[in-house]
């Protein structure tokens, strides 16, 4: 969905294959393009499942493939499209961390986490799902401030003006997220806020889940290692700055991360040493402006070029080098020769 503006601006036609779980926005965009006068065939929508995907990956007229989704599917897209000679950018999963230093403004950090962890019910690739607290004092204060905020989240259909969090995308995904919460409890994490049994009046059969908050999460737990893609925030306690950076850098994903601190030296060291494609300082979600490139490192991205910015233009264009000579305009005596080994 993010790619078509750059692709079309660079002179390409574009085929959008949206998720079968969320097909409507793509069709609405196509209708708006039609009303705006975009010529037929420039922006196209194909709905379908893996059969449609495989057809695009192998079709000889498709020159480039962009994808955003889970890491296993991103790997499949990258390998299959590359095998068929396509240029590929495949954005995969994420486990985005927000590190909180002892000197941070905790109220700002809490506000940031409420939006970054629970906005869109945590169903976005840049959601913050891990809060890394430097020191037990920071963690204790953060939990104390977060708990009532998570408990009081206004959960209702997204069409309601007062809604702060809506439902999950499918009943199957709701069951999956609930299962992860159960795993976290079984593995020894402290479930501070349990939203598994949340019910919205009048929507008892809806795919609603309350916000969930864990403390004392460790790096070997499933809720830390896996991308849950739901309203579940894990608090991990570390003893110092270096331990926090090491924790983040050792994760298999390297999509985005951010630090909350008042210390410029800590911020500079963090931004230079952390192994992630998008890094923020005192911002909830480190999404860059569109004129910069968007994308992660490690198992969060497959392919050499990111989305948007200069990388986006490079991806949707091809380099052409032109060399010319105009003999009638060359001064007398000029010589052209190719260097040889003789």
Per-segment meaning from a language model:
Residues 8, 15, 44, 89, ...:
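Structural detector of well-ordered beta-strand residues that form the stable sheet scaffold
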Residues 13, 21, 50, 71-72, ...:
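Gly/Ser/Thr-rich beta-alpha loop segments that engage phosphate groups in nucleotides
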Residues 38, 62, 99, 154, ...:
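Conserved C-terminal structural/oligomerization subdomain of aldehyde/semialdehyde dehydrogenase
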Residues 49, 68, 116, 261, ...:
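Conserved residues at the C-terminal ends of beta-strands
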Residues 55-56, 112, 247, 270:
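CheY-like receiver
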